[in-house]
Swiss-Prot record:
Lineage top rank: taxon: Bacteria
GO BP terms in the entry: L-leucine biosynthetic process
The protein's name: 3-isopropylmalate dehydratase small subunit
Family matches, as NCBIfam families: leuD, PRK01641.1
Assigned protein family: Belongs to the LeuD family. LeuD type 1 subfamily.
Catalytic activity: (2R,3S)-3-isopropylmalate = (2S)-2-isopropylmalate
A single cellular component GO annotation: 3-isopropylmalate dehydratase complex
Associated pathway: Amino-acid biosynthesis; L-leucine biosynthesis; L-leucine from 3-methyl-2-oxobutanoate: step 2/4
Gene Ontology MF terms in the entry: 3-isopropylmalate dehydratase activity
Free-text function comment from the UniProt entry: Catalyzes the isomerization between 2-isopropylmalate and 3-isopropylmalate, via the formation of 2-isopropylmaleate.
UniProt entry keywords in alphabetical sequence: Amino-acid biosynthesis, Branched-chain amino acid biosynthesis, Leucine biosynthesis, Lyase
Length: 200
């Protein structure tokens, strides 16, 4: 996973609340467990509507999604995060996230930045007044910049650290590789052990 420090990209104002994971990616697309190839499934039902925000040329290449409250509710599915990332989003801003979605996002390198709803409204106003406006999200400073507007966002220290370091679950484990190796070498042989996979 790549470290996340700052990101600048086109902001997309999604004026919808209670966006659940089935709206982010419908269940019909969950038949694969690979992490890529889900960009066409993102908001699939809504994108059939010509007036949907991502069908607007100004927002088609957006990478900072500014959504209404209660984003990512519903069932836990990593596919929702994969679809957002595959489309090109690096950041989702909302005043309230479902806990499971927020956790899945941090583990996959997608920043879920919590802003006050009043600040979300200000961001929407900027993005709708000047479609295609770039938004800069600074994880180190915990701020969002758009035009002359700067607003703070919240993220827990642990998730922030993981994103800054670019650590997914495997990366966290590999940081302890030497300790794990030492433990395995000193573990009594009569106890169960994990062996390398055999080819063929």
């Amino acid at each position: 996973m790549e470290p996340f420090k700052t990101h600048t990209g086109v902001g997309v104002p999604l004026r919808r609340s209670n966006v659940d994971t089935d709206q982010i990616i419908p269940a019909v697309y969950l038949k694969r467990v690979s992490r890529t190839g889900f960009e066409d499934a993102l908001f699939a039902a809504w994108r059939a509507d010509d007036d949907f925000i991502l069908n607007n040329p100004h927002f088609r290449n957006g990478s900072v999604l500014v959504a209404g409250p209660d984003f990512g509710t519903g069932s836990s599915r990593e596919h929702a995060v994969w679809a957002l990332k595959d489309y090109g989003f690096r950041v989702v801003i909302s005043s309230r996230f479902a806990d499971i979605f927020r956790g899945n996002s941090g583990k996959q390198g997608l920043l879920a930045a919590r802003c006050e709803q009043s600040d979300v409204e200000l961001l929407w106003k900027v993005l709708e007044t000047e479609p295609g406006t770039s938004v800069t999200v600074d994880l180190e400073a915990r701020t969002v910049h758009a035009k002359d507007l700067t607003v703070p966002f919240e993220i827990d220290d642990y998730t922030r650290w993981r994103l800054l370091e670019g650590l997914d679950d495997i990366g966290l484990t590999l940081r302890q590789a030497e300790t794990i190796d030492t433990f395995e070498k000193t573990r009594p042989s009569f106890k169960p052990a994990t062996l390398p996979a055999r080819a063929g």
